[in-house]
């Protein structure tokens, strides 16, 4: 480290050793921002044509995705697999998962703060006007379990 002030962005487990040694510090994370706690910021998307033509494929994908997320948070063996794959300790793998990727943040069935998201889309000029309930229903299609 150069003893200069620098700001960066990182995704754990990168940087955890430096945090532990006191070489760097976390001054804020996305989990600290109230705006992110009140709205969904991660989604899985496809286009309408692909969804229409391959709906069964997407349904199977979502089933597997949900099973994988459940496994990641329920079975300690998942931490060992991740730790071995990344080359870190199981403790660090658990810290990465629990501290930086809370289960609810990767839940594909959880959409929160839709009113705020729609208003932000207009304010930030992603869309000219708020979407109607029918448009939102067409846009957000969560496959059944």
Describe the residue ranges of each PLM region.
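Pocket-lining segment of extracytoplasmic ligand-binding domains
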Residues: 1-82
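Short secondary-structure boundary/hinge segments and terminal tails
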Residues: 18, 35-37, 100-101, 137-141
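Conserved C-terminal helix/tail region of periplasmic/extracytoplasmic solute-binding proteins
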Residues: 121-145
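Secondary-structure end/capping motifs
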Residues: 52-127
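Generic structural "secondary-structure junction" signal
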Residues: 46, 53, 108, 138-144
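Preference for short coil/turn "hinge" residues that link or interrupt alpha-helices
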Residues: 17-20, 44, 99, 120, ...
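Residue-level detector of family-conserved "landmark" positions at structurally sensitive sites
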Residues: 29, 93, 131-132
């Amino acid at each position: 480290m150069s003893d200069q002030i620098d700001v960066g962005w990182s995704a754990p487990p990168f940087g955890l050793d430096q945090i532990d040694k006191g070489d760097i510090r976390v001054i804020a994370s996305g989990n600290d921002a109230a705006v992110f706690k009140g709205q969904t910021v991660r989604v899985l998307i496809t286009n309408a044509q692909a969804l229409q033509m391959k709906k069964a494929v997407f349904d199977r994908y979502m089933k597997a995705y949900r099973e994988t997320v459940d496994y990641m948070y329920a079975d300690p063996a998942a931490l060992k697999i991740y730790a071995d794959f990344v080359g870190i300790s199981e403790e660090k793998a658990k810290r990465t998962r629990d501290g930086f990727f809370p289960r609810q943040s990767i839940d594909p069935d959880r959409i929160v703060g839709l009113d705020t998201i729609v208003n932000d889309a207009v304010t930030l000029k992603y869309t000219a006007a708020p979407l109607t309930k029918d448009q939102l229903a067409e846009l957000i299609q969560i496959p059944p379990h």
